[in-house]
Curated annotation (Swiss-Prot):
Region called Disordered, residue ranges: 43-90
Record-linked InterPro entries: Cell_div_ZipA, ZipA_FtsZ-bd_C, ZipA_FtsZ-bd_C_sf
Protein's name in the database: Cell division protein ZipA
Name of the coding gene: zipA
Keywords: Cell cycle, Cell division, Cell inner membrane, Cell membrane, Membrane, Transmembrane, Transmembrane helix
Role: Essential cell division protein that stabilizes the FtsZ protofilaments by cross-linking them and that serves as a cytoplasmic membrane anchor for the Z ring. Also required for the recruitment to the septal ring of downstream cell division proteins.
Length: 308
């Protein structure tokens, strides 16, 4: 935009200069032409004066000579303009001519306006508008300094994220796995024979007058499972071994137990099967039914709940 403005200013200045030059040149030309007309008139009058007079030998009619002399007045040798009022040709028109000459002097020279070459207009849609930056506006604007806010920000309270407590898994209810060993038919187990079989399989007579299997064979470790009399009150009469007899015994594993529950169950099942084999009895479940593989799997599922 700035460059276009400068170009238009230069073109306008050149056009004005051209018009002024043309006007001066035209006025001088008209002035010189006026002076040329005056010189022609003077030279014509002088030429008339310098014409040779007719020789005396040639006779002309006197009337014609007299008429010419009377009609024409000899001009003086000076540069004065001829008196046009005495000429019959300019009679009555001298005033108009003088008036016209005066008007021509007063009339200013006509200025012939030359066509200015204008640049083709370009539509606004064709011209990409560029942002105009006014440097004067930028220079005049003084930077404003904002005072720091005196407002003290409110203290931000720390966000307390509640600790997610681990979900407490409820401990399974206590359970007891029971395996019975019963004599064949109505047969009963003899006390001494029974006690010897139990002791050979790692059980030790102890608390509550029953046999216990400890975590170690010495009997100093924790109790893993126990064996009681099937008949109430459930204890054994060891001193009366020869006289004591029972239809069967019960192995029981309390859950949870000391050590690994699945290992303790396998050990109790194996001990019950060995005692039943030695005494000639049958291995029964808690309801005194024959212990089947399906019942064994059920026992294992119950024990698995207590495995760590």
């Amino acid at each position: 935009m700035q460059e276009l403005r400068l170009v238009l200013i230069l073109v306008g200045a050149l056009a004005i200069a051209a018009l002024l030059f043309h006007g001066l040149w035209t006025s001088r030309k008209e002035t010189s032409s006026k002076f040329g007309k005056k010189v022609d008139i003077d030279f014509d009058s002088e030429s008339e004066d310098e014409q040779p007079t007719p020789a005396r030998g040639f006779e002309q009619p006197k009337e014609s000579v007299v008429d010419v002399r009377q009609e024409r007045k000899e001009p003086a040798f000076g540069r004065d303009e001829p008196n046009l009022s005495q000429d019959p040709l300019f009679d009555g028109g001298t005033d108009a001519i003088l008036k016209q000459n005066a008007e021509e002097k007063e009339v200013e020279p006509k200025v012939i306006e030359e066509p200015i070459m204008t640049r083709p207009s370009i539509s606004e849609s064709m011209v990409k508008e560029e942002p105009t930056i006014s440097f004067s506006a930028i220079d005049d604007v003084e930077p404003t300094f904002h005072k720091e806010s005196s407002v003290v920000p409110a203290p931000v309270e720390p966000v307390i994220i509640p600790e997610i407590e681990p979900e407490v898994v409820p401990e399974p209810e206590e359970d007891v796995i029971v395996i019975n060993v019963h004599g064949m038919g109505n047969e009963r187990f003899n006390g001494n024979r029974l006690f010897n079989s139990l002791e050979q399989n790692g059980l030790i007579f102890g608390d509550m007058a029953i046999y216990h299997r400890h975590s170690d064979l010495a009997g100093s470790g924790k109790v893993v499972f126990s064996t009681a009399n099937m008949v109430a009150p459930g204890h054994f009469q060891v001193p009366e071994g020869e006289e004591f007899s029972t239809p069967g015994i019960s192995f029981f594993l309390p859950l949870p137990c000391n050590g690994e529950a699945d290992y303790n169950f396998k050990l109790m099942l194996q001990t019950a099967q060995l005692v039943a084999s030695e005494l000639g009895g049958n291995v029964l479940d808690e309801k005194r039914n024959m212990l089947t593989p399906n019942k064994i799997d059920e026992y294992k599922q119950r024990v698995k709940v207590f495995c760590n």
